[in-house]
Amino acid sequence: MASFDPTTLEIYRALYTSVAEEMGVALRRTSFSPNIKERRDYSCAVFDSSGRVIAQGDHMPVHLGSMPMAVAAALAETRIGPGDVVALNDPFAGGTHLPDVTLIASVVSGQWAVVSGQRKQLHAAHRTLPTLFYVADRAHHADIGGATPGSMGLATDVYGEGVRIPPIHLVRAGEICDDVMKLILANVRSSKERQADFEAQIGSLKTGANRLLEIVERRGTKEALQYAEHLISYSSRMMRRTIDAIPDGSYQAEDALDDDGISGKEIPIRVRVTIKADRARVDFTGSSPQVAGALNAVEAITVSAVSYVFRCLVGTDVPASAGLMEPIEVIAPEGTIVNARHPASVAGGNVETSQRIVDTVFKALSRALPGRIPAASQGTMNNLTIGGIDPRTGLEFSYYETVAGGMGARPTLDGMSATHTHMTNSLNTPAEALEYSYPLRVREYRIRKGSGGKGRHKGGDGAVREIEVLGPALMSMLSDRRKRAPYGLRGGDDGALGRAFIIRGDGSREQLASKGSWELRAGDRVRIETPSGGGFGKSG
């Protein structure tokens, strides 16, 4: 490949990254649901004409590492012409779990015509012009159908989890496909909110496409595409350099999920990380078979988790492009917890199993890089959904949230308290926004003081969040680290286990399993005490 100018490369890194970031801002500011506009449960990225990622926003790792497989599936199954938008969420066709819906659009020189709710006639010539880029966004919809509000319950197959959307056109030539939209909305709760969020995603794609066309117009198509290629190659070289600095060898580790909510049995995840020169192989052979409950991860999730771990080892100035994964091979045997076969239920694979994969790979690498790898963070997203009829309006509501916990202690610093870590990068819904949007009241929200694992550097403390329901509702929870604590490293203590309770209106208290659904009455409270991070090094 031709040589490049380092200064110009950095300019393009910033340009393409700013496109993805601005897409995220547009999505956040125009979305309707608190889960997107307040919690920022979305991600945006820019791809080249082959579907290779060029740049990502600083969004959700679990989305970003798996989104390339969604784009690949869309390109394999459909033709995305000018003004088209393809949607998908099918975990077995490039998706991850059903609430995360990905929208993808092409960018063709000289036109863009996706405007939500407005018809645009595309010039026929544009339909034959070559695609320059693709833009994609993924957002977690607070309900996508299924047996329980929030679509995060304990289904035993994917059919019970909600609406599966294979790669399909949601917009053609700038016009929303009303039949497709109606079909989706007929099968979800709070359909007006879902529709508004889909339209916000479409608008985000328009923003990204317009910005990319401005770059091409300002700097020229040839140079813009050449430097997209340079960004990918540069990322690959930097990742190979990072891997080459790890001592050659084979490093093994095991961790486990508590259970799948059905069998009560621990679910082991085993990994062998083999480093040879400037390449890495991450092999999950020996991990648990897929399970009946909703903790199964599809291959895209496992690749995403591995991508995140190795991304943490590379400097932040290295472009987050497809090149990062070129020197890394991931072996995830089909039919296991890390690469489940259809029709496995997968709601928790995205949010819980991804965290345990990260914990396990970091644990293996800690044997090779003892001075760089942190202790385990809380290792769960504490997924909480509450839904029913809002007594204030008589309309359906569906509340979804992940609750922060403790970060693992670092080799030179304490872990941070009450924060989202690893595969999530979201926020907790502000109490004011939560109470305005839902028939819920935040009774307590604080740091779980003293819960972090002790050590030379202390693990971050977990959080306490207590929410009262103001009317009858169904609550579901998918969480973990209730039986096996987040590990400490180098002599540091483990973090505290998480726990959750229902406090009934009469004052009685029921401790909850980590996974399940429960009926709530007006005045009942849900209390979650999240796990803390492990400590690093011996105290004193």
Segment roles from a protein language model:
Residues 1-97, 101-110, 130-281, 285-540:
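Glycine/proline-enriched, intrinsically flexible loops and inter-domain linkers
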Residues 109-131:
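Short, basic, low-complexity termini and linkers enriched in Ser/Thr/Gly/Pro
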